[in-house]
């Protein structure tokens, strides 16, 4: 067994290919390739007869392995993210987007790579609110976001679908802001995802990262609904029935994002989506001088 010593955190842990793989994927490298590199690092340490190494030695050896494979840009990104983690820079990521665009899957993958332990879905926040606030007081939070217009009276000359959706977002965003305030106050790494993460209703600070996830056409949404139904108790037909309404909400979210300067990320393939977000985060962190 190889023991890795982290002098800054004053801890000693067994070498883990899984942990190293996660660090390497932050550089935008496919998980399979990252795992192969982590395995090479482990084998070289074993060949050298190493029983104890430092995190600095692991970092340098991994960096060299990336260079040997011609992955110069990836090697640079690897060092960047490792340094960021060493300095304990707080990371807060907010992912918005219409129902079924893949926010939860993207959030899980991002959190794994960034080492963020806290993922909070806005549907969970809404569910808590439903338990403590009666339907008679806030009827909109007791229905699906794309059906809120049925319980909210929209003003004349307004789009009832969007007005109902905005009403629900306005109420749920109170809970989102509370989660954000706690993360800021306590310096916690946090990832918040959900349809209620809407630009303008939730305002990220300069050192926080917000993205709106979208799909190119409704066929992608329909496929997502059926795929999701295979692994959960959600009825795909309920969502397919209202897919046009959901796409209208997506159009609204994309427009809001552009108005507020929030990046819109088209989700066609998971690895590409996650890599795009990580690259954008790295660029912004570098611009901030982090």
Swiss-Prot record:
Pathway participation: Thermoadapter biosynthesis; cyclic 2,3-diphosphoglycerate biosynthesis; cyclic 2,3-diphosphoglycerate from 2-phospho-D-glycerate: step 1/2
Keyword ATP-binding applies: yes
Domain called ATP-cone: residue spans: 1-89
UniProt entry tagged with the keyword rRNA-binding: no
GO molecular function: ATP binding; kinase activity; phosphotransferase activity, carboxyl group as acceptor
Entries under InterPro entries matching the protein: 2PKG, ATP-cone_dom, P-loop_NTPase
Enzyme class: transferase
Catalytic activity: (2R)-2-phosphoglycerate + ATP = (2R)-2,3-bisphosphoglycerate + ADP + H(+)
UniProt EC number: 2.7.2.16
Superkingdom of source: Archaea
Cofactor list: a divalent metal cation
Alphabetical list of HAMAP family matching this protein: 2PGK
Family: Belongs to the 2-phosphoglycerate kinase family.
Function of the molecule: Catalyzes the phosphorylation of 2-phosphoglycerate to 2,3-diphosphoglycerate. Involved in the biosynthesis of cyclic 2,3-bisphosphoglycerate, a thermoprotectant.
Protein name: 2-phosphoglycerate kinase
Organism expressing this protein natively: Thermococcus kodakarensis (strain ATCC BAA-918 / JCM 12380 / KOD1) (Pyrococcus kodakaraensis (strain KOD1))
Gene coding for it: pgk2
